[in-house]
Amino acid sequence: CAMTQTSGRSDKILVVDDDSRIRDLLRRYLTQEGFEVFQAEDGKALNRILLRETVDLIVLDLMLPGEDGLSICRRLRAANDRTPIIMLTAKVEDVDRIVGLEVGADDYLGKPFNPRELLARINAVLRRRPVAEAPGAPSSENEVVQFGPFNFDLGARSLHKSGQELPLTTGEFAMLKALVRHPRQPMSREKLAQLARGREFEPFDRSLDVQISRLRKMIES
């Protein structure tokens, strides 16, 4: 079933795909799973929806007419929009998926796909969010980890270097959290995938390597 916040409302999913059959399929399937679903056929329609709605996750097709999925993802992240993004790609080349993660997508799924697999990925990404808490309530995770010039605030889900915030995607946050919670421990890809994503490592999945590389560049720069 769909994950809900403490207010009891359903999570809002925005599906962006120029194929109306895929949009309708996902609208029906995700609505049955308890989500509130919005649909957009391109970047302009996405912009109109985001002006009036705050969504919890975007399912974004890579190949769109006009502004493509990579450009949309890059634009949203440049505007400091941290809404989780799962990218759909019919392209078989690894490079397209890797670039998607490098510009800030949280996960990807190749077409054709099983809607149940997309649902599992949606729920996994949404689980990485902070739990909404009552105003004034102490954070359930108020730990701040310091290393070198960095402050990693688990409650605020933020990383600062010498006072300057470095934006993290939900996937990067989950990965950094797993690493700082297990310092000086050898970490296999299998263990890291389980800790950061709650799912088994897939042998041909390069996304772990990409997110580790992004974190390393962020920390070493």
Regions found by a protein language model. Name each.
Residues C1-L14:
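Non-catalytic signal-transmission and effector/linker regions of two-component phosphorelay proteins
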Residues S10, T54-D56, N80-P84, E202:
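His-Asp phosphorelay/catalytic-motif detector in bacterial-type signaling
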Residues D24-Q32:
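Charged docking surfaces used in two-component/phosphorelay signaling
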Residues G34-G43, I49:
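Short hydrophobic/Thr-rich beta-strand motif most characteristic of the beta2 strand and flanking loop
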Residues L50, V59, L70-C73:
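Hydrophobic alpha-helical motif in two-component signaling modules
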Residues T54-V59, L64:
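Active-site beta3 strand of CheY-like receiver
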Residues D68, R74, A78-Q146:
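Basic, amphipathic DNA-recognition helix from helix-turn-helix-like DNA-binding domains
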Residues A105, S158-S221:
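Positively charged, aromatic-enriched patches within helix-turn-helix-type DNA-binding elements
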